[in-house]
Amino acid sequence: MAGRGKQLGSGAAKKSTSRSSKAGLQFPVGRIARFLKAGKYAERVGAGAPVYLAAVLEYLAAEVLELAGNAARDNKKTRIVPRHIQLAVRNDEELSKLLGDVTIANGGVMPNIHNLLLPKKAGSSKPTEED
């Protein structure tokens, strides 16, 4: 049967590739799709929705990890601990707004000294003229 295309069973079986690798992501697209379907957020879930959500989550995780790594390096540490994540999130304006109501366990508080409690500068006052 010439001209009928490939016959069944001929050639090597095609290696399956994950949707994460097709999208160039590290986060699991298939697992996120399963969670979206099982969570009953909608009756149906489009094919692009889990890919987009995985990309957004991966970007946020990378952003937080980069800032937390910088905070750890500033403190001369090689391991990221919750304190570094807290410092990274609270020092970034957009992440602080996004995670404003989130409590990070073992994160501590942001260092803050009220201006009234700071020592006064000696050279800042102007000399007064007396006649």
Curated annotation (Swiss-Prot):
PROSITE patterns: HISTONE_H2A (PS00046)
Entry-linked Pfam families: Histone, Histone_H2A_C
InterPro entries: Histone-fold, Histone_H2A, Histone_H2A/H2B/H3, Histone_H2A_C, Histone_H2A_CS
Comp. bias (Low complexity): 9-23
UniProt entry tagged with the keyword tRNA processing: no
Ranges where the record places region Disordered: 1-23
Post-translational modification remark: Not ubiquitinated.
Keyword field contains DNA-binding: yes
Cellular-component GO terms for this entry: cytosol; nucleosome; nucleus
Disulfide bonds: none
Tissue expr: Expressed in meristems and dividing cells.
CDD domains: HFD_H2A (cd00074)
Keyword list, A-Z: Chromosome, DNA-binding, Nucleosome core, Nucleus
GO molecular function: DNA binding; protein heterodimerization activity; structural constituent of chromatin
Localisation per UniProt entry: Nucleus; Chromosome
Binding partners and assembly: The nucleosome is a histone octamer containing two molecules each of H2A, H2B, H3 and H4 assembled in one H3-H4 heterotetramer and two H2A-H2B heterodimers. The octamer wraps approximately 147 bp of DNA.
Family: Belongs to the histone H2A family.
PANTHER family for this protein: HISTONE H2A
Designated name of the protein: Probable histone H2A.3
